[in-house]
């Protein structure tokens, strides 16, 4: 069973990018996602701007994100990726690469894991452009060589990697929950609770503080 190598734009249905315009932020509407909002296994919608419905429709008419598309950060922190598994996508993208697969889940997962590989990361590093702010050109993404084994081999590799990915997501969720509990406990004990025995004091009353001296 031999492997072949094809360009990314031959493996994917389409490789495009989000809008290059700067829609005016709104108080409500639809979310506009940029590279900084990609957090690996999730998108940080809380810090993303709202844009108007008219601007949203304008953006998605050119580069709508669909289920099993891969988002790729092209500017700033380059190489962050996110695989969209939601069948109902209601956000737009700006300055971001979009690998499209026309709903082909198997191909999407193969490309997703390849983009995480040392080989793909090395290719990206050698094809960056820009002196003041580095960026990955769209042409570089399209020309990226992608190793493609037979489908049975791809399926076997994905079957190994996906459970590991799912475990990472689960552990991250547990860590986030523990952090929220710790923050809630801190607020309850030190901010929200009135305590007559609590007082403000100097650090030296509770700690031994020494200053280093020059020999």
Question: Model-predicted segments: where are they?
Answer:
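Non-catalytic DNA-recognition/assembly elements of restriction-modification systems
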Residues: 1-18, 143-214
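A short glycine-rich beta-alpha junction/loop motif
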Residues: 2, 74, 89-97, 129-158
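Sequence-specific dsDNA recognition surfaces
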Residues: 5-24, 36-67, 204-215
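Residues that recognize and position ribonucleotide moieties
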Residues: 1-4, 31, 89-90, 113, ...
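A short beta-sheet element
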Residues: 34-35, 53-116
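Short, positively charged
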Residues: 108-140
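A generic structural signal for short beta-strands and their flanking turns/coil linkers
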Residues: 29, 47, 93-95
């Amino acid at each position: 069973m031999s492997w072949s190598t094809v360009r990314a734009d031959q493996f994917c249905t389409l490789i495009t990018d989000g809008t290059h315009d700067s829609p005016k932020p709104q108080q409500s509407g639809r979310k506009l996602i940029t590279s900084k909002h990609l957090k690996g296994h999730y998108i940080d919608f809380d810090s993303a701007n709202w844009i108007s419905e008219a601007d949203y429709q304008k953006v998605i008419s050119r580069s709508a994100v669909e289920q099993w598309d891969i988002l790729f950060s092209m500017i700033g922190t380059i190489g962050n990726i996110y695989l969209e598994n939601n069948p109902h996508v209601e956000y737009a993208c700006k300055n971001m690469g979009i690998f499209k697969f026309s709903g082909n889940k198997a191909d999407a997962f193969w490309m997703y894991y390849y983009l995480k590989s040392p080989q793909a990361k090395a290719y990206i590093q050698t094809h960056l452009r820009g002196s003041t702010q580095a960026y990955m050109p769209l042409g570089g993404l399209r020309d990226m060589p992608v190793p493609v084994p037979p489908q049975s081999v791809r399926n076997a590799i994905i079957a190994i990697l996906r459970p590991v990915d799912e475990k990472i997501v689960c552990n991250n969720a547990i860590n986030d929950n523990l952090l929220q509990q710790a923050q809630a406990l801190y607020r309850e004990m030190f901010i929200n609770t009135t305590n007559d025995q609590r007082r403000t004091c100097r650090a030296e009353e509770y700690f031994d503080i020494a200053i280093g001296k020059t020999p």
